[in-house]
């Protein structure tokens, strides 16, 4: 039995390769790659995702973070075009043509990747794809190894994001049990959160409150906690504070490097 040789590269050669720098859709927050935004049902994840899509399509800042103008595809798989229209009017009177919506799509291993790649071919300026929700594109089955299934599914989407140098954001749910580490509350196995480039958890301390914390962690971003407040009139999550900007204490600075 022949063994395939490892494809290695020495450190000196690696340092001499002029790789293209990482591109950010939202500066310091959402780079190219695969990302997961999780929150409890009806907490306001979709409002946040829609506003993010608008900001990216218009090239307007998301809170204090600059965005890179790009075309955006938002797969709203739990909504209708009528509901999306209503929400758009709540957010803006001038929605850009660079923001695209779909309410139906194939499942992950049954044509979804091909559908997205066809869209990217027709819209080469696309920088962000949002899938709302992750569960809608996954087949229902009784996997013997849920971790392997989660990791495999996420791997397909990560490969898509890396291949086209775009950001793909998956909207997902939290498990009901509380945990001191918000990332442990992401529904599913660690095969989901472990295979993504970034994870975001939107969490309220009490269900009826308008305030929440967005916990942000990833391979290419600093860990930060964004305190947010939902405005019931504008339907926008407003930024109250950013843990990376609060204090000049050495420990806080190191935490955000």
Protein language model features and the residues they cover:
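Gly/Ala-rich phosphate-binding loop of Rossmann-like dinucleotide-binding domains
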Residues: 57
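Hydrophobic positions on the alpha1 helix immediately C-terminal to the Walker A/P-loop
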Residues: 48, 52
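Phosphate-binding/switch region of NTP-binding enzymes
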Residues: 21-24, 36-38, 42, 46-47, ...
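Conserved inter-motif catalytic segment of the P-loop NTP-binding fold
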Residues: 2-7, 12-14, 19-21, 25-26, ...
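Pre-Walker A (Motif I) flank of P-loop NTPase domains
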Residues: 31-35, 70
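Short alpha-helical segments that sit at the start of domains
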Residues: 238-257
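Conserved phosphate/pyrophosphate-binding and hydrolysis machinery centered on Walker-type P-loop NTPases
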Residues: 143-147, 186, 247-248
